[in-house]
Amino acid sequence: MNLSDNDVPAWWRRLGLPGLVDLHTHFLPERMLRRVWAHFDEIKPLIGHQWPIQYRDNQESRLATMRRLGVRRFTALSYAHRPKMAASLTDFSLSLAAEHADCVPSATFYPEEGVLEQVQSALDRGARVFKIHAQIGAFDLREPILDPVWGLLADAGIPVVIHVGSGPVSRPGITGPDKLAGVLARHPLLTAVVAHLGAPEYGEFLDLAERYPWVHLDTTMAFTDFFERLAPFDPALLSRLADLPDRVVLGSDFPNIPYPYAHQLESLERLRDREPRLDDDWLRAVCWYNGLRLIGE
């Protein structure tokens, strides 16, 4: 299999789908995006590999790429790394969604004074998905100031894409499955979407998905050749992944990926060679139905 981006529409048509739903894509203010790309340009000393950005284009070109691929619903995920950033990032993401109907209204938050009010405001303005990045933000998900936020989002049934796995760079005391486990113990109905399948702690995050009915896992970068070098997925866990067909959603990390978008899809399709239950029905659920259900459509 050697899928190219030009082949992607034929790929999802073969599955009988009207397109793709990708819950882990990034659209950021230009200045912040340039800083993110600069970070990836310098990441080799931390992970041992270069990370060349595949889609280093302007915003209109990136939107056009999403549509050319047939991504019918995508997110504008952002994340704050310090106080007094989250509100403006949410404003940007919600404004983008207001201008582009295929962009899911997205928001973020940070453990700071007024966070509950910020999250409520985002919900009032139509936010359908939130994103936080504990590793970059350098905060513990269990911080007391966030407890009412988790309760609010659990009650609202709004998904939160959470990067709390220890990959690609561990942050002791901040990352790891125990942080999310602490939140879920208090808010068991939280719709938590674990980014990158929780890499590299795949098994521990599968434990949480098996224990809590609203924990989901996104496929972002998982199983790609690039990520298998950094955080290989234990083949012995594939049967457990297949046991949760309604709990896995497509994520890609577009545009900040070091390979064509199509490679994420072919990486998922080739899993059937090792676990036959990860078949076309599984791909349909992952690439369309599960994500659509989470965003309430």
Regions found by a protein language model. Name each.
Residues 20-23, 75-77, 106-107, 131, ...:
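Active-site neighborhood of phospho(di)ester-bond hydrolases with catalytic His/Asp-centered motifs
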Residues 90, 115-116, 180, 201-205, ...:
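Short, well-ordered alpha-helical microsegments
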Residues 65-68, 121, 182, 207:
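Well-formed, non-transmembrane alpha-helical positions, independent of function
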